[in-house]
């Protein structure tokens, strides 16, 4: 079983995931689909995503994909390999299986692993800042912290997909 050291995920600006002294960062276009999958799973944390839904989100109409189900399995395998870099020295983890789970035809991000995502923290701070029942100093501090977390638009290097545009609009 994996230890419970928290993951820190940055999705505003450069996409990266850090855990302890280990970090994986999206670089270049070669691994774009892998990061796209990870982004979908993290953004929908707590939800089971059917294979069909993931295929629909990952391969747009016109994208050439002969065997989407097999392509998805391969992509999940590659994502798990990438995430293995976050496993700490003293942990036993079977090929990233702890990060991405699969059951009954659906994939999901493992909710048992503590995870802090910049966009979620920023949203929470902005909400606290807008709470008129709080002291003005507290509200200003919350807004200041929220602004500090904004490092750029949501997943800027992952393309032009509709779900990404919808999220970007929330944070602008």
Annotate each predicted stretch with a short phrase.
Residues 1-37, 97-106, 113, 152:
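Short boundary/linker motifs that mark transitions into or out of structured domains
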Residues 17, 44-72, 157, 161:
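Positively charged, aromatic-enriched patches within helix-turn-helix-type DNA-binding elements
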Residues 18-21, 80-91, 99, 124:
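Short regulatory "switch" loops immediately downstream of catalytic or recognition motifs
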Residues 25-58, 79:
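Short amphipathic alpha-helical recognition elements used for nucleic-acid or partner binding
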Residues 30-39, 65-89:
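DNA-recognition element of transcription regulators
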Residues 44-47, 61, 82-86, 132, ...:
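Phosphate/oxyanion-binding loops and surfaces in catalytic or ligand/nucleic-acid-binding neighborhoods
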Residues 63-67, 92, 99-172:
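Intrinsically disordered, charged and Pro/Gly-enriched terminal/linker segments
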């Amino acid at each position: 079983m994996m230890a419970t050291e928290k993951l820190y995920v940055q999705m505003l600006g450069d996409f990266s995931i850090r855990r302890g002294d280990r970090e994986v960062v999206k670089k270049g276009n070669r691994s774009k689909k892998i990061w796209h999958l990870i982004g979908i799973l993290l953004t929908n944390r707590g939800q089971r995503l059917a294979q069909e839904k993931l295929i629909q989100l990952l391969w747009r109409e016109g994208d050439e994909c002969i065997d989407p189900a097999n392509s998805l399995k391969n992509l999940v395998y590659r994502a798990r390999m990438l995430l293995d870099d976050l496993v700490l020295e003293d942990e036993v983890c079977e090929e990233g299986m702890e990060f991405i789970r699969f059951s009954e035809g659906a994939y999901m991000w493992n909710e048992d692993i503590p995870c802090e995502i910049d966009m979620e923290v920023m949203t929470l701070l902005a909400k606290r800042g807008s709470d008129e029942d709080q002291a003005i100093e507290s509200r200003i501090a919350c807004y200041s912290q929220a602004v500090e977390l904004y490092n750029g638009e949501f997943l800027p290097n992952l393309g032009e997909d509709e779900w990404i545009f919808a999220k970007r609009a929330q944070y602008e």
